[in-house]
Regions:
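Short acidic/polar alpha-helix capping motifs at helix-coil junctions
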Residues: 42-44, 71-72
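Bacterial Sec-dependent signal peptides at the C-terminal "C-region" and cleavage site
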Residues: 16-26
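Positively charged n-region of N-terminal signal peptides that target proteins for export
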Residues: 1-5
Length: 185
């Protein structure tokens, strides 16, 4: 009897340890660690090192060309490929830079120069913050500008954020076609 109890305890300890190690090894991040009790979102300070690169956009605009780099919390692409949706707690960070260019031997080359803004989204399948105007349509929405990179400045996702995402409504408000890692290995 003691042998069986010891075996059960050993098995439980092993499984708990295995799950913890698995979580640690895939670097899964709970996006709600970035959210306070009122639903205020902070920008993750280490997203360039810990998050996956989803994709890059070049936006050529007469008002100012931009480079958009989008990162996702670890495990996002794998989960999306398996389920066709973003997991609850997924974090997306879009870092927007200005763009510079020069004539090089190969052509007119362009590159990112000077961060302008960061957009941070946290997937919320449970509608946790229904009274917060920065939460809705399945996401928490936040905007941070270069002049105060730790200060969230959006006031209402319907006024400040979702307008740019309307063409992507059918894909959970995200332009997934720009992120091939979500659909291919």
């Amino acid at each position: 009897m003691i042998g069986r109890i010891s075996f059960v305890i050993f098995t439980l300890v092993f499984l708990v340890g295995y799950q913890a190690a698995k979580s640690q090894s895939n670097g899964s991040i709970n996006g709600f660690e970035l959210v306070d009790k009122a639903g205020n979102i902070r920008k993750p300070s280490d997203f360039r090192n810990r998050y996956e690169a989803l994709g890059t956009y070049a936006v050529l605009d007469p008002k100012g060309n931009q480079m958009h780099f989008t990162y996702a919390s670890p495990g996002t692409a794998e989960y999306y490929r398996e389920h066709g949706t973003f997991a609850d707690g997924t974090v997306l960070v879009k870092e927007v830079f200005g763009m510079d260019h020069a004539q090089m031997t190969t052509s007119d080359a362009h590159w990112a120069s000077g961060a302008k803004v960061w957009f941070v989204l946290v997937k919320d399948q449970k509608q946790r913050f229904g009274n917060n105007p920065l939460w809705g349509d399945g996401w928490g929405w936040a905007l941070f500008k270069a002049d105060a990179p730790d200060k969230q400045v959006a006031t209402d996702y319907k006024k400040d954020c979702v307008g740019c995402h309307i063409p992507a409504k059918s894909t959970d408000w995200i332009y997934v076609r720009g992120y091939p890692v979500l659909t291919s290995r």
